[in-house]
Amino acid sequence: AIPSTYRSQISMGLPSEIKPEDITILGGLNFEKGKIALKTENYTENDAVKALLKKQMESFGKTNGTFVKYFPASTLMFINMGVKGDGLYNLLSENKEFRSTVSIAKADEVKELFNSFNGDISAGLINVTMNSAPTFLAYADVKNGNALEALYKNKQSLGMRKGEDIMELGKDEYVYKTRGMNIFFGIKDKQMYATNDELLYKSIGKTVDKSIKDAPYAADMKGKTVFMAINAEAILDLPVVKMLVGFGGKEFKTYSDLASKVSYLSVSSEGETSETD
């Protein structure tokens, strides 16, 4: 039996008629040259679970790799997924936690934002330092910029705190200002973007010389609905990590030596099958 502590965590967000024990995960571990792969697949005889899994599959589609050219190969963590916005919103709207978070006043705006998604969504953790918030970059295929325009026009209803504001920088260009950081976001050529780095904002839509297309895991992304990669080599090369290893004693050195044996870790999903490499 699943301990009650873990049961509540696993069950969070699931419909009441679905219990974790109704879902069986079948897996196999393969050892290949220079690679360890864990493949898993969901199995159930519960009709409610089957219906939920079907809705999940209908909310995602195969990725096209539209945005990989904008992310450097040194990206620390990269997530890529193919999204059908209207299906995803319908799926989330059945989630009790989601409904309690999104108020009735904001429901239409949130629905329009989700419905605008139509294709790839890519996000990456670009850099981590001791002096500022981690740098991120995100892109999404969208139908139009109506959702962001509506968000800006109705910003007074968003319940922003003192010191927070959304300012218009130009047509379909905005910045969300807080005391801690600025988040630049907007629409360019039917591509939504967001970043908290001004230099990245100024180069939105420009390809980088050595991109994720050249990363060792690039070929593994093809045909997947969801893909995530953690670049162990790039993380170990961060100045902040090198400093921790240098001053952290034997324990940090041991972890660093273990991590140095790994090039990258990837997790992907294609239909009901998931793979971890």
Locate each region found by the language model.
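Non-transmembrane, amphipathic alpha-helical segments
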Residues: 105-109, 177, 213, 272
